[in-house]
């Protein structure tokens, strides 16, 4: 291994190399997201995982041809125009109503219980040119369909509709007919039907993250001294310093009509149970620390909570400084859609605010981000951007004040319309990642986290592990809670807490997994024992590093809720540096972990950052990644590894 002087002799990092690392980020992040669809459980050994990876790679090589599968080249039946379905009052009225109900029901199922519906516009964008009488008739038919589907609606925006409180039309559009955009949301039968969207809140220290969440949840304004953020803090020193140091959780509920669920008493904060029972959609915020001292905690929160969106907070008087850039880079590396909120505009001089906006726009348009910034200034911008936010190239930007309340209504409306983002496999084997542990009096050990795949019921027998030796313990799920409300079942994509029977809290930790102990296909036969690994091979991209990286290099590696020091034991070339994309073999320093091919990894050491994806579990030292490397470079000082996985004896 080369000395530090030799590495600098090869040349320190130049500005051009740093830009190369930033430019490669977007393409590699897209590649990682595609490869995650090939994720396979690591239960059949490294050879099967390698074969799965190879097959997935060969399929991905022709991914550009997949569009042919989505084209309907057959002679399709001509579609009936929506205007005819809305206004047909003849003999085919019942058939038109049935077709329209089927269209709305399909959209509700696709949107996990909510959808947007346009009246006055066809699916291809053509105007229906509805008169006032036709508008009233269309709404009457929609109302009957909503009652039949057990759903409610909210009129988000109208154009050219008389006496509408949300009309955004103008004099030049009066001849173009009545137009309206509706939010349709199904009434949940129980808590299990509630729509859940997870948002990670990041930004530099003193950007106003906790204060904004306090204002949104309580429904009251701040006093400029942090009055509303106190309820979000978990520790005494956080209240005294005013700075978050742990991963905080808060929820915001919306009912079926799109109204925020708040207490009737001004300033009173509702409990999670009250919000969960009255809400049809719940926004789960993960409040993360902004100080550089707590970067590991912040990265852990970003990966373990599996957020659907990322909310970046920027103080108007400070700009995008300090850890804000680090957090933005991590969110981009994880391919999470980003929205930006500029706070403290009430105390910021106009010229400083303009400098912040210019800096933010420049960074978002840079090759590493490739975002399209859209400034939300009115209700129409808010609704149109929220409906198109499924495109990750869009980055909405809000300018708010927690003291005066300016533009906070736009933020609430945006969160209400925000579409459900993320794909989860309910039919796959159950897998639950633990991101926190508790000891509850008279209940016992409780673990919380996110269900990665599958379905689990209260009373199921599960395996919890691995421990330091790679062993899994058998236990039973005593009860399940979501948002502190007891539920009988939990499925993929939902965050939940499990009360475990006969397990001590000291025996569970963050980063463990919970797996079913029996197979659904054959309940009487025990499932194959989970295999855990200390070594794995990943394809990585070096985002930033001052010099070169060789074998024996160590860094903190994050895989979901797992945070552990890893050492590089093999590389497919002599060394790698900023902007390089390489195949690397890692080895956990402390203990083996449960890994799957397709898991996304993030490793860092100070300002050094790298992104990657697991390509193979296990590593065979007799088959080095770089056969041409000198023998002493691959074996001297590196602990020789074996190809065998550590199999638990549950």
List where the protein language model places each region.
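Alpha-helical scaffold elements adjacent to nucleotide-binding pockets in ATP/GTP-utilizing enzyme cores
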Residues: 141, 212-216, 248-250, 297, ...
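Phosphate-binding P-loop
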Residues: 189-196, 277
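P-loop NTPase switch module centered on the Walker A-proximal segment
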Residues: 198-293, 305-310
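Conserved catalytic-core segments of large NTP-driven translation/proteostasis enzymes
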Residues: 198-206, 210, 214-218, 362-546
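Polybasic/polar functional segments that serve as interface/processing modules
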Residues: 1-192
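Active-site glycine-centered loops adjacent to acidic/histidine catalytic or metal-binding residues
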Residues: 343, 401, 606
